[in-house]
Structures are given as C-alpha cells and as structure tokens.
C-alpha cells in the first residue's frame, strides 16, 4: 500500500512538468564595440557589461580534455544516464538521514543542474526534486549530450561575475577556452 501511494505521488508530478527548453534560458552577455586603428587592426574600444559576464563558445571549440574534466568533476556518468544518475540520487537521499559522507553529496547531474538554472526553481523539497528529475529526462530526449554540456559550460559561474567557460578562461588564464591545456582545464 505504501509503495503504491508513493508511485501515485511521484507520477502526479509527471503531469505537472511543462516542457523545458534550453532556448528558455535568459543568458546575459556583454556587448563589445570595435573600431579600426590607424594600422587597420580591429580593437575593442568599449565594452558594455552586465552583472554577470559571459562569452558564448561552441562545444566544438572546447577541447575534449576540458569537456572530460567537467564531466569527471560534475557528473562522471553523464554520457551513460538519461538525465538522472539514480545511484547518486539515492546516495544523496540516504546521506541526508544516515550521514555516510562528511559533506552533503549532491545527487544532481549536469542535466539536472541545467534544469535548475533554466527554471530558477531552487525550492528545497521532494516535489521540486521529482519535477527536476522528470524535466531532466525530457531535456535529454530533446537535446544531444553535447548541446546540454555546451549550454551548461556556457552558463555556470566561475566566481565573482565570471560566467561560462570562455569568460573564465580569458579572465583567469588570459586565453580562450579552446587553448586551455590539461592542467588549466582541471
């Protein structure tokens, strides 16, 4: 009876999930104004900045070792799950009560973190987590792993007002993300 009630409770959230798309993300970008100097070289003469600074970059321009470093750190089973890492989710849930780990272990996958950023839903509740799980599975059906990873890497914060891998690479290493070496990517 308890199991049936739990299944009915969880399945009610399936109908509550609206389609979430990557295109819904509101990303703020800086605007750069360029002019040619006396030698004909284009130079940045003015930059209009937003609260968060971000420079978009295609997944094709992000080296494989940089992608691998993100996946290894954030979601080691990213390429094999359907948006939800059930092992991590159950482990994080059990840790809330039993404290197996010294710190709170996140159970969210890259896709789930992206959902949280798209929706802005940060409520700490089982119902939000269930909605997030269904939305993550939906997003995984609608987009490729590369598109999800690209959007995630262009969105996440790297400290201060720096958001996205390209802005962070330029800020911290003085180079494009496409030029990061293995040590810098880690």
What are these regions (language model features)?
Residues 1-186:
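Juxtamembrane regions of bacterial inner-membrane/periplasmic proteins
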